[in-house]
């Protein structure tokens, strides 16, 4: 069993954290985020460190203990540095471009796919085959990157499609004659 919850979360320099009951609020140079911890854990702010403790020893409480600690760490890092996810596009004629705030993708369909950028997320296209999704909320950045990838995920024969920059596609061999 993971014991990640035992480690206290250090509040980084330049970030102010506030604990009000179960609600943890973090304010930093990139913005402000909050997280409401589950009722099965207690959250305390002690000398610039956030400490999370389970209220009982049930398996459910211990699981929520580790999850709450990780979520608090994510919001503290998000308001200080932010998160970003890079996507790469492979394939002949596959490309991306920005149309105002919307992302326009040419992915081999009969029409271009237009993805509307959600609030709190920034999408940049440094090259026509590269997309950078950034924001302060780790979950939202990952969700937007997954939604863009879902339009045309990488296929195993030629590797065409949208993939994460760090993702490795396991290639298959084609049919033999």
UniProtKB/Swiss-Prot annotation:
<dbReference type="InterPro" id="IPR036789">
    <property type="entry name" value="Ribosomal_uL6-like_a/b-dom_sf"/>
</dbReference>
<protein>
    <recommendedName>
        <fullName>Large ribosomal subunit protein uL6</fullName>
    </recommendedName>
</protein>
<dbReference type="InterPro" id="IPR019906">
    <property type="entry name" value="Ribosomal_uL6_bac-type"/>
</dbReference>
<keyword id="KW-0694">RNA-binding</keyword>
<dbReference type="Pfam" id="PF00347">
    <property type="entry name" value="Ribosomal_L6"/>
</dbReference>
<keyword id="KW-0689">Ribosomal protein</keyword>
<comment type="similarity">
    <text>Belongs to the universal ribosomal protein uL6 family.</text>
</comment>
<dbReference type="GO" id="GO:0019843">
    <property type="term" value="F:rRNA binding"/>
</dbReference>
<dbReference type="InterPro" id="IPR002358">
    <property type="entry name" value="Ribosomal_uL6_CS"/>
</dbReference>
<dbReference type="GO" id="GO:0022625">
    <property type="term" value="C:cytosolic large ribosomal subunit"/>
</dbReference>
<dbReference type="GO" id="GO:0003735">
    <property type="term" value="F:structural constituent of ribosome"/>
</dbReference>
<dbReference type="GO" id="GO:0002181">
    <property type="term" value="P:cytoplasmic translation"/>
</dbReference>
<dbReference type="InterPro" id="IPR020040">
    <property type="entry name" value="Ribosomal_uL6_a/b-dom"/>
</dbReference>
<keyword id="KW-0687">Ribonucleoprotein</keyword>
<dbReference type="InterPro" id="IPR000702">
    <property type="entry name" value="Ribosomal_uL6-like"/>
</dbReference>
<comment type="function">
    <text>This protein binds to the 23S rRNA, and is important in its secondary structure. It is located near the subunit interface in the base of the L7/L12 stalk, and near the tRNA binding site of the peptidyltransferase center.</text>
</comment>
<keyword id="KW-0699">rRNA-binding</keyword>
<comment type="subunit">
    <text>Part of the 50S ribosomal subunit.</text>
</comment>
């Amino acid at each position: 069993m993971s014991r990640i919850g035992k480690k206290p979360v250090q509040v980084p320099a330049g970030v102010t954290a506030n604990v009000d009951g179960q609600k943890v609020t973090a304010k930093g140079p990139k913005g402000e985020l909050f997280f409401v911890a589950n009722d099965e854990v207690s959250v305390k702010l002690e000398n610039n460190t956030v400490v999370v403790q389970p209220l009982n020893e049930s398996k459910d409480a211990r699981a929520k203990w580790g999850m709450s600690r990780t979520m608090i760490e994510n919001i503290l890092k998000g308001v200080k540095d932010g998160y970003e996810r890079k996507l790469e596009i492979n394939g002949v004629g596959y490309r991306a471009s920005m149309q105002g705030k919307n992302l326009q993708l040419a992915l081999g369909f009969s029409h271009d796919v237009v993805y509307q950028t959600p609030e709190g997320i920034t999408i940049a296209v440094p090259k026509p085959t590269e997309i950078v999704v950034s924001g302060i909320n780790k979950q939202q950045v990952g969700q937007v990157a997954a939604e863009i990838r879902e339009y045309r995920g990488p296929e195993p024969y030629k590797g065409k499609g949208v993939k994460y920059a760090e993702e490795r596609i396991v290639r298959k061999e084609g049919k033999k004659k």
